[in-house]
Swiss-Prot record:
Belongs to the UPF0283 family. PANTHER family: UPF0283 MEMBRANE PROTEIN YCJF (PTHR39342:SF1). It is a multi-pass membrane protein. HAMAP family: UPF0283 (MF_01085). This is UPF0283 membrane protein YcjF.
Length: 353
């Protein structure tokens, strides 16, 4: 005997359908499009780099503006007028046999010649600094290029500018690692991994030394005026040292443009309360509580010196930063705190003896 049919059961919620993954349509690039393809530039600037880093970039990187062109044009016109007037005075003095005026014209010509030579030298140094920015852009393009033939000549030019001899072990390892089948990206990458770290290590040592000197000088110095003068002098020397390591010679005008940033740095060294408050972001609360006011001020000034050196190093390098080879402020912070601890311990132990 058959069983009776069960009544229908109605559910309040509808049945859930299993989600099906939707695939995107395949995208293919032709050979012509692949040649013109360029990866999008990604801003790798850390979040902590703000107004201070922009000020360093503005101070170190040469600019071109309409105001500057107008001033240079006015100076050129004034110089041409002075030369023309000098020639006229010389001719009049020669015709009238006024030897005193003729001697004055000769002295003026020597002074003008020296001034023109200084201007030409300064322009050449600014042009060299501007060329370094172009070389860095060219290196960035080569690091994303698959062409062949430009990488080796470019790297050899960088080594020559930096004063690296052909017999240098790092350069010899680079020559041994490259071969004809490698493209420009691989050759420049090998140079960045084998040769460029030699100069970067020297620049790091200079930054560490100058930052430590700034820290210790402020800790032991009782006069704020001496602190400010010392910070200004050491910061300018640090910029010059880093530029020399990378084969760049800074001129008088470049130093004037850096002076604004140095003033910001020495003002920080002279404001102990501000340094102590900002220093909480760089070191822990317990360590800041154990350190004295002068020690906290010294660490703050040393960190600013290190930050200035890092930015100068970045703008003087012929190659962009690759992976994580950019020096970090935290590395110098740990070194400064360690050196300061040793100095304070030695100063405490010496009176006991």
């Amino acid at each position: 005997m058959s069983e009776p049919l069960k009544p229908r059961i109605d559910f309040a919620e509808p049945l859930k359908e299993e989600p099906t993954s939707a695939f995107k349509a395949q995208q293919t690039f032709s050979e012509a499009e692949s040649r013109t393809f360029a990866p999008a530039a990604i801003d790798e600037r850390p979040e902590d780099e703000g107004v201070a880093e922009a000020a360093v970039d503005a101070a170190l990187r040469p600019k071109r503006s309409l105001w500057r062109k107008m001033v240079m044009g006015g100076l050129a016109l004034f110089g041409a007028s002075v030369v023309g007037q000098g020639v006229q005075w010389t001719m009049n003095a020669w015709q009238t046999q006024d030897w005193v005026a003729l001697g004055g014209c000769a002295a003026g010509a020597l002074i003008i010649g020296a001034g023109v030579g200084s201007v030409v030298t300064e322009w050449r140094r600014l042009w060299r600094l501007r060329q370094r920015a172009h070389e860095r852009d060219e290196a960035r393009e080569l690091l994303h290029s698959h062409s062949v033939g430009k990488g080796r000549a470019f790297c050899e030019k960088l080594a020559q500018q930096a004063g690296i001899d052909q017999s240098h072990p790092a350069l010899q390892r680079w020559y041994a690692a490259i071969h004809e089948t490698q493209n420009d990206r691989e050759i420049v990458g090998l140079y960045a991994n084998l040769v460029q770290p030699v100069l970067d290590a020297q620049a790091r040592r200079e930054i560490s030394r100058f930052a430590a000197e700034s820290t210790l000088m402020i800790v032991v110095s009782p006069l704020a005026l001496v602190d400010m003068a010392f910070i200004a002098w050491r910061n300018l020397r640090l910029i010059n040292r880093i530029a020399t390591l990378y084969g760049i010679e800074l001129g008088y005008y470049s130093r004037l443009r850096l002076f604004r940033l140095v003033l910001l740095n020495i003002a920080f060294a002279g404001a102990s309360e501000l340094v102590r408050e900002v220093g909480m972001d760089w070191m822990s609360q317990d360590l800041a509580a154990r350190l004295s006011t002068r020690a906290a001020q010294g660490i703050g000034a040393g960190l600013l010196t290190a930050r200035l050196g890092i930015k100068a190093m970045e703008l003087c390098r012929p190659l962009p930063w690759i992976d994580n080879d950019k020096p970090r402020l935290g590395d110098f912070r740990r070194q400064l705190i360690g050196q300061l601890k040793e100095t304070l311990q030695k100063s405490k132990s010496s009176p006991e003896k």
